[in-house]
């Protein structure tokens, strides 16, 4: 096979892959998100104020009032294999409505959104940070950005302050954005149907349950 034919075949492969991606993995637009919310295909409670929370292809979620902080001064390290270790090295802090939480530079905190989100078996959710907050050094997830088909609960935020100045977070502020992507077909086993799903129906920033993995 000549070099030109190889290049042509490579380009055709790229085109086919892109076609399959756009055919089966579409991100919902603002119009489709409104339809999904209206038909209860996607359920967000309390209902978002679309005038301020709906983006071109995402819904902004607001910060809840519950935080889980790490008490690093009492423990030298974390042992993920130890049962209930998080209860020993973390503590829950609840902030009053419209209250604030100060994140110090380099701090890592678990939090939840004010909203509960329910995703159908033929969609997945993806949590993203907001650019305006990212420019201040705030990240909203360290690794877990994907919410499986069938998810039902409050999304947990893995907040980190990468900057050199403290950041004041206010309960109820728009903290992150969630997009929704179509699957090629409905999941055979949605998240809430999984026997060993560790975080289904959560409504608080629960500690890591990695020790439960088989």
What function would you assign to each model-found segment?
Residues 1-25:
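N-terminal amphipathic/basic-hydrophobic helices that include classical n-h-c signal peptides
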């Amino acid at each position: 096979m000549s070099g030109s034919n190889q290049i042509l075949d490579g380009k055709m492969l790229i085109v086919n892959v892109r076609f399959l991606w756009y055919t089966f993995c579409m991100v919902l637009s603002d119009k489709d998100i409104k339809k999904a919310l209206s038909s209860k295909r996607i359920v967000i409670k309390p209902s978002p104020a679309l005038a301020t929370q709906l983006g071109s292809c995402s819904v902004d979620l607001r910060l809840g009032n519950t935080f889980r902080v790490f008490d690093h001064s009492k423990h030298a390290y974390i042992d993920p294999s130890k049962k209930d270790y998080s209860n020993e090295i973390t503590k829950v802090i609840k902030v009053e409505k419209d209250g604030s939480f100060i994140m110090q530079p380099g701090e890592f905190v678990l939090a939840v959104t004010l909203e509960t989100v329910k995703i159908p078996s033929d969609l997945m959710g993806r949590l993203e940070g907001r650019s305006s907050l990212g420019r201040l050094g705030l990240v909203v997830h360290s690794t877990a950005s994907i919410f499986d088909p069938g998810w039902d609960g409050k999304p947990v935020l893995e907040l980190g302050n990468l900057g050199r100045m403290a950041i004041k977070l206010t309960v109820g502020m728009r903290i992150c954005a969630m997009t929704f992507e179509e699957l090629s077909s409905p999941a055979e086993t949605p998240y809430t149907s999984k026997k060993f799903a560790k975080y289904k129906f959560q409504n608080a920033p629960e500690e890591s349950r990695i020790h439960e993995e088989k």
